[in-house]
Amino acid sequence: GLGDVYKRQEYLLDAPQSVHTGQKLHVNSAAGYWSAFRAVLHTAYRDRKIKENPNGFLDRIESIPTMREHLSQEELIRLAETPCEEEVLKRAFLFGCLTGLRKSDIKQLTWQQIQPYTNGKMFVTTRMQKTKQIVHNPISDEAYRLLGERHDGLIFDGFKDKMLQGPLKRWLLAAGITKKITFHC
């Protein structure tokens, strides 16, 4: 019943982040999981798996706005000059910093999307994975060099999400950067 649903919300707000840290799940993570759970309930109601839509009785878990840290130009230069254990991570991350493209779009990038302007400069055409909009972004010579040699398949082939944990953190630390930096999703 509805009491069980409330227990799930209470659990999320008190759930451990992992068994290793013992820290609670961040409220924004709990809000995201709760929202997904509410969507499942709505789908079950819409598909007539349950008779009532309990979402009208359930409170949302409010997320907290977060401040993202950014790299300064000096830090970006330092990072570019610092060796990284995963070369494809280094190229993809720096390309993202220079172009503003999301990680999801960079992972899918192919050479067919890289085109010259009439002035000889290059641009990248992407269908934003999140918004489905087609966007033409000019890219700098520095960003173009990060693409490497022209080839078939994905430009940043081998770039994996798991690289954003240990390898990215170690690379940032090696460059003397202690800010909490993430890859734009």
Each model region followed by its residue ranges:
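Short helix/loop segment immediately N-terminal to the Walker
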Residues: 16-25, 178-181
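Basic, Lys/Arg-rich DNA-contacting stretches centered on the C-terminal catalytic core
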Residues: 19-22, 61-70, 82-84, 104, ...
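Alpha-helix C-caps/helix-loop-beta hinges
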Residues: 40-43, 47, 112
